[in-house]
From Swiss-Prot:
Family annotation (CDD domains): ATP-synt_F1_beta_C (cd18110), ATP-synt_F1_beta_N (cd18115), F1-ATPase_beta_CD (cd01133)
Chain's gene name: atpB
Cell location: Plastid, Chloroplast thylakoid membrane
Pfam families assigned to the protein according to its UniProt record, in alphabetical order: ATP-synt_ab, ATP-synt_ab_N, ATP-synt_VA_C
Name recorded for this polypeptide: ATP synthase subunit beta, chloroplastic
Organism: Trachycarpus fortunei
Matches recorded under NCBIfam families: atpD
């Protein structure tokens, strides 16, 4: 059994009880601190710099290196403006600890676990240190089980693993945020789970927009904050690298509590995992490490591993992680995305071409992949249906150039049938979302995996060849598509 979180945070009580050091050097976000002999803090201990006299300064740092000669090197979690050599530094005697549990839901926190949403203080009776070891082998749940999202294209073609890690690839404006919000909504409704969102080094405006959209869609319940389905932890682009480097761990620590103590299924969103690596590379040289390939930190794999290995299923519950991955200059061989890929179980690729056609969620059925899509895991029926959907979509893609030049009439009868079915499949992969109801006016749909498979089998078998393709656009299950086709027929007769 893992140790429970502490029920009191390491508060700096009186100066006499704590180790006191003094700042010896400041280089940007990195501080060197001298402590008395024999009173050195441990690696990862939190240090607090207090201002002199009337100056209100309260900067928290984290010990990264013990340099010898009673000096330690620490990374600041907030701006070091106004700090001077000789200032007193207090060793708290423990790592950074953050509030965990139900009190975190519906609130926004910074890397230190302090609320930043102007909604008053948070109950901090239960806190947990952000540095913990990954669960032991004996605690892991190694069964392969599908994490049903209720989103047709995901469940059929690139299913998520319960306790797995999913990479979310997509440019600006293709629907990443809406997809993330729908997943948060569906895990709460279908799995009774909660979500934690870690905003790592992204734009402050985007963080604010996400918060506002979550309030609009009901994911954050303003009237009764305790009924919210998500906790938000932000370390945005304007924060020092120390905060961006640790904010992912703060979010993960909150998620671990829901998994280990509340025994819930948790969704952990990290947006963006690349910024976590980038923040580490910013301080790496200041910490005196030799850079490795492309200037990244030599500890890149270790840092990534220590975060990713804590994201897993245990016998108590699961943390399923969805990580937005920025690919610098679209170079997939760059060490940062390449290291991330090694940890992913599935990839969900969002396509601008599909978004332009108005097909939402704009998940690319051919580029998205999953290690779960194997007959021994998902079953023969699911696997066969998914493969046939992909084959039909691939054939349609190959024929598009011919159609553009010569037109549909020049295709063989068989190819014309394939194109017609592929267009129905493309539209049936779209789906109305609960969180988009306020914008679209059409009620959201949660489609179970069995219903999804049945629908695509009917399209592939040719039973629905007589229905118009627009009947399949933005519907839930296949019965809704047939009902919509009948309505369209009635409408067209009335017009005549």
């Amino acid at each position: 059994m893992r140790t429970n979180p502490t029920t009191s945070s390491p508060v700096v009580s009186t100066l006499e009880e704590k180790n006191l050091g003094r700042i010896a050097q400041i280089i940007g976000p990195v501080l060197d601190v001298v402590f008395p002999p024999g009173k050195m803090p441990n690696i990862y201990n939190a240090l607090v710099v207090k201002g002199r006299d009337t100056v209100q300064i309260n900067v928290t740092c984290e010990v990264q290196q013990l340099l010898g000669n009673n000096r330690v090197r620490a990374v600041a979690m907030s701006a070091t403006d106004g700090l001077m050599r000789g200032m007193e530094v207090i060793d708290t005697g423990a790592p950074l600890s953050v509030p965990v549990g139900g009190a975190t839901l519906g609130r926004i926190f910074n890397v230190l676990g302090e609320p930043v949403d102007n909604l008053g203080p948070v109950d901090t009776r239960t806190t947990s240190p952000i540095h913990r070891s990954a669960p032991a082998f004996i605690q892991l749940d190694t069964k392969f089980s599908i994490f049903e999202t209720g989103i047709k294209v995901v469940d059929l073609l690139a299913p998520y693993r319960r306790g797995g890690k999913i990479g979310l690839f997509g440019g600006a404006g293709v629907g990443k945020t809406v997809l993330i919000m729908e997943l948060i909504n569906n895990i709460a409704k279908a799995h009774g789970g909660v979500s934690v969102f870690g905003g790592v080094g992204e734009r402050t405006r985007e963080g604010n927009d996400l918060y506002m959209e979550m309030k609009e869609s009901g994911v954050i319940n303003e009237k009764n904050i305790a009924e919210s389905k998500v906790a938000l932890v932000y370390g945005q682009m304007n924060e020092p690298p120390g905060a961006r480097m640790r904010v992912g761990l703060t979010a993960l620590t909150m998620a671990e509590y829901f998994r280990d103590v509340n025994e819930q299924d948790v969704l952990l969103f990290i947006d963006n995992i690349f910024r976590f690596v980038q923040a580490g590379s910013e301080v790496s040289a200041l910490l005196g490490r030799m850079p490795s390939a492309v200037g990244y930190q030599p500890t890149l794999s270790t840092e990534m591993g220590s975060l990713q290995e804590r994201i897993t299923s245990t016998k108590e519950g699961s943390i399923t992680s969805i990580q937005a991955v920025y690919v610098p200059a679209d170079d997939l061989t760059d060490p940062a995305p390449a290291t991330t890929f090694a940890h992913l179980d599935a990839t969900t690729v969002l396509s601008r071409v599909l978004a332009a056609k108005g097909i939402y969620p704009a998940v690319d059925p051919l580029d998205s992949t999953s290690t779960m899509l194997q007959p021994r895991i998902v079953g023969e029926e699911h696997y066969e249906t998914a493969q046939r959907v992909k084959q039909t979509s691939q054939r349609y893609k190959e024929l598009q150039d011919i159609i553009a030049i010569l037109g549909l009439d020049e295709l063989s009868e068989e190819d014309r049938l394939t194109v017609a079915r592929a267009r129905k499949i493309e539209r049936f992969l779209s789906q109305p979302f609960f969180v988009a109801e306020v914008f679209t006016g059409s009620p959201g749909k949660y489609v179970g995996l069995g219903e999804t498979i049945r629908g695509f089998q009917l399209i592939l078998s040719g039973e629905l060849d007589g229905l118009p393709e627009q009947a399949f656009y933005l519907v839930g299950n296949i019965d809704e598509a047939t009902a919509k086709a009948m309505n369209l027929e009635v409408e067209s007769k009335l017009k005549k």
